[in-house]
Amino acid sequence: MTIQWFPGHMAKARRQVTEKLKLIDIVYELVDARIPQSSRNPMIDEIIVNKPRIVLLNKVDKADPRVTQQWLDYYKEQGIYALAIDAQAGKGMKQIVSSSKELLQEKFDRMRAKGVKKPRAIRAMIVGIPNVGKSTLINRLASKKIAKTGDRPGVTQAQQWIKVGNELELLDTPGILWPKFEDETVGYKLATTGAIKDTILNMQDVAVYALRFLTSHYPEQLKQRYNLNEIPEDIVELFDAIGSRRGCLMGGGMVDYDKTAELVLREIRTDKIGTFTFDDPSEAEQPL
């Protein structure tokens, strides 16, 4: 399923999440560790209001560990629980349950004080934009394949409760929430990491953004991957250097810029060049 976000779809997604909030104790806000700010829903704070929340930075294996720690420090300063996880490999799964119990300790203490000897399982809902790994996280927590997974945005379609041991019940929310497109750069970050379909933006433009970012922040990885002694300042020359070295050519030996763009983005997404984080906590648009 491909989600094209229009006002009607946004209103429906918000309504679905809001309705289910009445049923749950805690929200797991799933973001991409490479773009923790850009992969947040723009209205998430409004939508979940006063519900306890844990921010889960997924795909941490693809992110710059130094910047991931900066993001964790940032969330701590904001008074927000945050965990760095890798749902694909199962990293951080136990901490999700233990952190949830810690956050909800007072609530369950009150239940015991009222005579509830054995409080029920924690009820949680995962929210996030498409393709941040929601289904993968559900499958990992449940220790079996329940939710359909894939690399295409918006692959989850049905709504279901998932029991995770005796301590946690997960609500899988269909349609998830829409990404924000507040400015061009956010769109490029979403496209670079594969959070939105490649047909939404021009892939050459996305690759230009990605290469300029890597040139500025991760030049050594870029030089090593493409055997460059120096990185050309001119972006066309950089495309030419990469395309010619990797055989992205048209007839007559001319570099095929479309193929070069596809190559660069594919190698970023599959970690062939290295691990990167495109959002910096110092540039966070607003406190959580």
Curated annotation (Swiss-Prot):
GO molecular function list: GTP binding; GTPase activity; RNA binding
Highest rank taxon of the organism: Bacteria
PROSITE patterns: G_CP
InterPro entries per record: G_CP_dom, GTP-bd, GTP-bd_ortho_bundle_sf, GTP-bd_ribosome_bgen, GTPase_MTG1, P-loop_NTPase
Record GO cellular component, one term: cytoplasm
Keyword flag Glycosyltransferase: no
Keywords, alphabetical: Cytoplasm, GTP-binding, Hydrolase, Nucleotide-binding, Ribosome biogenesis, RNA-binding
Record Pfam families: MMR_HSR1 (PF01926)
Role noted for this protein: Essential protein that is required for a late step of 50S ribosomal subunit assembly. Has GTPase activity that is stimulated by interaction with the immature 50S ribosome subunit. Binds to the 23S rRNA. Required for the association of ribosomal proteins rplP and rpmA with the large subunit.
Protein name: Ribosome biogenesis GTPase A
Species name: Priestia megaterium (strain DSM 319 / IMG 1521) (Bacillus megaterium)
Gene giving rise to this polypeptide: rbgA
